[in-house]
Amino acid sequence: NIHENETKQRELGFCEKLMSMGHSVLKLDMSEPLVEPEKQIEKFLLEHSTIDGIFAINDFMAIKVMKVMEKFGKKAPQDYQIIGFDGLRNAADQTYLLSTIAQPLDKIAQASVKLLLQLISKEKAVLSRVLLPVYFAEGGTTKKNTEIT
């Protein structure tokens, strides 16, 4: 499954970078299909109550983690920091509520249309895998560099 591989690459890259900077990494791996993810998240966070930084594999999972942390009386970014992945926001003109690694949706759309047109015209597909740059989109769930001690 290509999506699983890309998701694993996402996780691996993030963990490798943290470890190269001297940070320890604890991982909660949940198998799909997800069954009661909030309960798994709650159990993990209870077992590791000193966690102060979280990378969620996507923005939806980050929101689930934030809901669990709210149950514990913790708020981001005061008590912990969290970064999602995908660049979720309600509308293009809104700011990000969640700090996230955002994907260039316009470039994704362009590459998708190009591939689709190749398939429709029965051309040999030139694009099978496209790597596009991502960027950090600051939301309200991480501290600014000046706030980090």
Segments the model singles out, each with a brief description of its role:
Residues 1-149:
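Bacterial carbohydrate/catabolite-sensing allosteric modules
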